[in-house]
């Protein structure tokens, strides 16, 4: 459709969703690894479901909203598509509304009330492992998605169907309609093969306590953000990945900045990005990284979702984690295929 060809597994995902709906399931998940085109799948919903009513797409970050908007427009050029976020207001006649959860998910939100429940038939959640949060529940309840007789369909997309805080997604979603894992996608040559090196730092994590299924960040930072360990990370990168483009995942902002300094002191072109950084500064760094002016970007939790740079062929886990969700997301930043890429080094 309009130059966006569906891959076989994307066709299968759409067919599986239609089947689930006919079987009476109304809240379902699709699990696809990062980089396998989940946006393309949900952007085909208006066609696949022969949609008569509107579609609402929910995401919690601006990058995800913009990516979704581009795909919806490319695949559905005749539909009116609008974003509802901050100072952008969706026009009432938009057939696809792409909405920011922080904008409409506050209880009593006038902007949520303005979206008439009966006008919508499909609700899509990107990065659905967030869907157990209260802001999402507020939105789901507004649309009556838990009513036993609802005809609306809620579809969540995730690369990792387990949520870190053990709540699980079972209280929101009834079933996983379609799933493919990283191994299958690599075997079918849709993602780059992954190879790994373990570098022993001698750092003991014995004293670091766990909360919500992962290490407590402040305690973890004290142990791993040391000059000696940071320099070891840089040396390992220079030895194992001298010509690769790397993303380095750190514990917190201070660690990301310290890691950046360690790379720079060793002569590696590196910059740090973090959540509170101004949007223009962040975009400038990522543009330099894309162009090759920078070889390494250090960050904490910022590039785990919605960051697409297919040339990344090295992911450095400078932060230990117990979370399968976080680990999968971090690896997923480097698994996209690119002509110049032989494999991903973790």
Where are these predicted regions, by residue range?
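Conserved interdomain linker/interface between the two RecA-like ATPase lobes of SF2 helicase motors
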Residues: 176-247
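Conserved helix-turn-beta segment of the N-terminal RecA-like "Helicase ATP-binding" lobe
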Residues: 63-85
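Walker A/P-loop
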Residues: 23-46, 249, 273
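Conserved pre-motif I regulatory segment
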Residues: 1-31
């Amino acid at each position: 459709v309009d130059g966006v060809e569906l891959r076989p597994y994307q066709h299968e995902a759409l067919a599986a969703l239609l089947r689930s709906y006919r079987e009476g399931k109304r809240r379902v998940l699709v699990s696809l690894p990062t980089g396998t085109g989940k946006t393309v799948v949900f952007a085909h919903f208006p066609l696949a479901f022969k949609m008569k009513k509107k579609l609402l797409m929910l995401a919690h970050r601006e990058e995800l909203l913009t990516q979704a908007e581009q795909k919806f427009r490319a695949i559905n050029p005749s539909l009116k598509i609008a974003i509802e976020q901050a100072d952008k207001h969706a026009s009432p006649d938009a057939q696809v509304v792409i909405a920011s959860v922080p904008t409409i998910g506050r209880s009593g939100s006038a902007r949520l009330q303005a979206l008439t429940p009966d006008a919508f038939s499909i609700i899509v959640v990107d990065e659905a492992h967030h869907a157990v949060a209260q802001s999402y529940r507020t939105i789901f309840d507004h649309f009556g998605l838990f009513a036993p007789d609802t005809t609306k369909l809620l579809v969540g997309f995730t690369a990792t169907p387990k949520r870190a805080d053990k709540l699980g997604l079972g209280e929101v979603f009834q079933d996983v309609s379609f799933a493919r894992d990283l191994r299958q996608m690599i075997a079918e040559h849709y993602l780059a093969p992954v190879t790994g090196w373990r570098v022993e730092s001698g750092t003991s994590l014995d004293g670091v306590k766990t909360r919500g299924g992962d290490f407590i960040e402040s305690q973890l930072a004290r142990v791993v953000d040391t000059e000696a360990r940071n320099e070891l990370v840089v040396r390992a990168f220079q030895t194992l990945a001298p010509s690769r483009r790397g993303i380095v995942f750190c514990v917190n902002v201070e660690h990301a900045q310290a890691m950046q300094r360690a790379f720079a002191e060793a002569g590696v072109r590196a910059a740090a990005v973090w959540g509170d950084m101004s949007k223009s500064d962040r975009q400038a760094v990522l543009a330099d990284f894309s162009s090759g002016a920078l070889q390494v970007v250090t960050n904490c939790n910022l590039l785990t979702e919605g960051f697409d740079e297919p040339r990344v062929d090295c992911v450095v886990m400078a932060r230990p984690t117990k979370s399968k969700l976080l680990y999968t997301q971090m690896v997923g930043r480097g698994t996209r295929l690119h002509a110049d890429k032989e494999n991903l080094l973790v």
